Amino acid sequence: MSEPPQPPGKPSANAPKPAPRLKSIKPTTPGDANKITTPTIPSIKTKKEFKPNIPTARKKKDEKDPLSGAISDLISASLSPLAVVGDRPGKPNATSSGKFRSNLNPNRKKPAAIPITNLFQTPLVQAETQQPQSTYEMNKKNEKKDSDLLAQLFHEMEVDPMQPFHPTHLPLVDPRKIMKAYSLDDASKDLNETKRELEEKIKNGELSDTTNFTLNSIGSEDNNNNGGGSGQVKFVESSKKKNKEISTKDKPFYVEDQFLNKDKLFFIQLPNLLPSTQSKPNFNIPNPVLPPPKPTTITKTVTNPDGSITTTTIPINENTKIEDQPPPPPKELDEKAFVPVIYPGDFPPSIKEMPSGKLGTLKIYKSGKSILKIGTVEYDISSGDKLKFLEEVQCFQTKGGPDNSPTCYTLGIPSQHLVAAPIISQISGI
């Protein structure tokens, strides 16, 4: 039998039960985004979770700790490990409210961590801006200023620094203020006196005239700030050498400050071409020696068998034989004969073609500077390279030994090599 029709709103008793629909998974609060709730189904048993309970007695004991207070909180905070730069903050506790900050962008970029190497570097702070950490440093700076002022007073008052506790009279005026009264007239007098001293040194050979000097005005900052325009004028050497003493290279005849003036040989190197000037005078020029005139006739003497002698005169022509011509008379110099004088500009400027004899004059100054004068040209002599092997000075004579045999004489070992360079600035007329 068929079942009676049921009303449309009520299901039949034998109809299967529909499956329960799953609820949508949504977090209850924004803070529980990581917590997912599972749907509850009546036929499935839920798993129980174990949650330990804290005993109430222990809880009460912690609350009634006698060491609790502000001091214990400071001690615990000091014993807690410090966070290292670059560590990420921990996750928020479950008890925190799960509210997001409204002004925080969740897609923002994370700040870059500071490298650990930069943590141990010194801060970029000038030393002048750092304040002294204690009164000890301040007293130390004040003592340094006082010592500098005393050193300046010792220098100006000619006080012996080895006896700083010796009684003395200090000036009533600061010596730094005396410089303001230094007038231009005093500066010009000092300038002329310094110039005269330099000229005397150059004349004596103690100082070279090729050294450049410049005038510099030396004035303190206090004078410029207070309107003082006058400053002390001094000669300042513009060369890089701060030591004004003559170097060992400019003392060619000295070895370890000992003058080699006895039984010493020196090797002086001269240039291949020597500069010379036309110093031949234009007056009292001697006439050159003229050769004797050629004979026009030839005289012959013939001895006859009788013993008589006959002389014949034959004129010299182109057809005359050479045998018939007389030999030239020998050239003999008498005491009154003219000897030509050699002037510095007459010979070629080379060492090989120079006339033998006296070469020049050597001048050695007290300062050690040496100048060789050849003719009218002066040469500056300086020490050359040191001897690196054995050198001997020898003299050869072609006919000095027995039976007119050649002989060699050893004179000695040269003490030093010297180099002669012409002083071009003093040559005039080249």
Curated annotation (Swiss-Prot):
Annotated spans, Disordered: 1-108, 218-240, 283-313
Gene Ontology CC annotations of this record: RNA polymerase III complex
Keyword Transcription applies: yes
InterPro entries referenced in this protein's UniProt entry, alphabetically: RPC4
Subcellular location: Nucleus
Composition-biased stretches (Polar residues): 93-106
Biological-process GO terms, alphabetical: transcription by RNA polymerase III; tRNA transcription by RNA polymerase III
Segments of skewed composition (Low complexity): 35-44, 296-313
Composition skew (Pro residues), residue ranges: 1-10
Gene Ontology MF term list: DNA binding; DNA-directed RNA polymerase activity
Keywords on record: DNA-directed RNA polymerase, Nucleus, Transcription
Main location (coarse class): nucleus
Keyword Nucleus: yes
Top-level taxon of origin: Eukaryota
Record's subunit section: Component of the RNA polymerase III (Pol III) complex consisting of 17 subunits.
Family recorded in the similarity comment: Belongs to the eukaryotic RPC4/POLR3D RNA polymerase subunit family.
Function (record text): DNA-dependent RNA polymerase catalyzes the transcription of DNA into RNA using the four ribonucleoside triphosphates as substrates. Specific component of RNA polymerase III which synthesizes small RNAs, such as 5S rRNA and tRNAs.
UniProt xrefs under PANTHER family: DNA-DIRECTED RNA POLYMERASE III, DNA-DIRECTED RNA POLYMERASE III SUBUNIT RPC4
Protein name according to UniProt: DNA-directed RNA polymerase III subunit rpc4
